[in-house]
Amino acid sequence: MPPPSLLLLHPRTPLPHHHRSSFRTSSPRPSRMVCAAAEGFISAAPILLPDGPWKQVEGGVTAAKGFKAAGIYGGLRAKGEKPDLALVACDVDATVAGAFTTNVVAAAPVLYCKRVLNSSKTARAVLINAGQANAATGDAGYQDTVDSADAVAKLLNVSTNDILIQSTGVIGQRIKKEALVNSLHRLVGSLSSSIEGANSAAVAITTTDLVSKSIAVQTEIGGVPIKIGGMAKGSGMIHPNMATMLGVLTTDAQVSSDVWREMVRTSVSRSFNQITVDGDTSTNDCVIALASGLSGLSSILTHDSTEAQQFQACLDAVMQGLAKSIAWDGEGATCLIEVTVAGANNEAEAAKIARSVASSSLVKAAVFGRDPNWGRIACSVGYSGIQFDADQLDISLGAIPLMKNGQPLPFDRSAASKYLKDAGDIHGTVNIDVSVGRGGGSGKAWGCDLSYKYVEINAEYTT
């Protein structure tokens, strides 16, 4: 259906700025930092950035120039008063890109965002609600999404098509639209470029998550400092090809629309599409990426320039950091599993093998049981759908080689079991390294162990 027509103000008209108090942290453990906006509700995930020519900075989605965010409680959750409405807004028309679920039963907000991005190259804000997925809700659910976008647009004095919507929660439930609309004036009034604004938004989008996921980095491209920030949610119903995970990325780099969309697709394929918790692909997966262009960096117009390659690597790092935090926070998990595959013919084949290992319920259960059962790893490599010479298969668990040239190696089983136990005791990382030949292709995937707690959480999710 055609979108309602609203007056679009000058693209450089700033949004309201309501400054809030600075972000405060308390850190009994580095991986469990408590933010002021989230205090009493949820802690922050560990920062799991890969190494590279960038530095971590504070601010999440508000780190980049031109962005504000807010998260409030609007009464959408079934119980409790944890924030459940988030808004990320840009002062200018931001170049927009998105990636969406492959589930055929796509939620109303996914269908809406895809329609908007098919006709628009820019956006001004992303509204996210937690509590109702608004999936499998028919025409009425879709209209709820349009009405929500329209209501936000009027408060921000922009077009309805400038607003994107994300939803997460119980499938089959429509948005509590009255509660949402009644909360929007307060939500818009809370918009802030502060760190607290970013972190309150990161908390508001969570559901069964035990931690919020927020990250920001700064790098220098062409002598100009640029920032990329992001937030994500996800803990269960996580499987490659986007799963119940929502993500919002922001940057002050200036990138042409076509290049930005290709960069986002590439980074998603190397990050969010490489995580798995339970093998379920959600109806609501959605990553939205906004580029304000306010850094002062000349526009990136091609994929193959040095500046584009530097920026792509930084974008990869931010998305991988968020993706790893999601896998780390897998429902009931005691550790993160990182699978690295080398020696494949190309990156795509290596990524598929890594995904196969990280997705294996038997591998995940073995890690939880602190059982160094390399046979399960070898099996999951073999059924990945990628052809390789089994006589060149190498497998290591941490620093402990388990298989070489397709043959099992003698190893200290108690040391290998202790390696798994130690990782679980501190909610650390279990590294599984696989080589399938001498090709130049490499890739990574991330998952988590599979515990009794996972069944308990999901058996009681709607009850």
Swiss-Prot record:
Keyword annotations: Acyltransferase, Amino-acid biosynthesis, Arginine biosynthesis, Autocatalytic cleavage, Chloroplast, Multifunctional enzyme, Plastid, Transferase
GO BP field: L-arginine biosynthetic process; ornithine biosynthetic process
Any one GO MF annotation of this record: L-glutamate N-acetyltransferase activity
Any one Gene Ontology cellular component term annotated for this protein: chloroplast
Recorded metabolic or biological pathway in which this protein acts: Amino-acid biosynthesis; L-arginine biosynthesis; L-ornithine and N-acetyl-L-glutamate from L-glutamate and N(2)-acetyl-L-ornithine (cyclic): step 1/1; Amino-acid biosynthesis; L-arginine biosynthesis; N(2)-acetyl-L-ornithine from L-glutamate: step 1/4
Residue sites binding substrate per the record: 207, 233, 244, 331, 458, 463
Compartments, record wording: Plastid, Chloroplast
Known function: Catalyzes two activities which are involved in the cyclic version of arginine biosynthesis: the synthesis of acetylglutamate from glutamate and acetyl-CoA, and of ornithine by transacetylation between acetylornithine and glutamate.
Family designation: Belongs to the ArgJ family.
Note: This protein may be expected to contain an N-terminal transit peptide but none has been predicted.
Subunit-structure text: Heterodimer of an alpha and a beta chain.
PANTHER family documented for this protein: ARGININE BIOSYNTHESIS BIFUNCTIONAL PROTEIN ARGJ, ARGININE BIOSYNTHESIS BIFUNCTIONAL PROTEIN ARGJ, MITOCHONDRIAL
Protein name: Arginine biosynthesis bifunctional protein ArgJ, chloroplastic
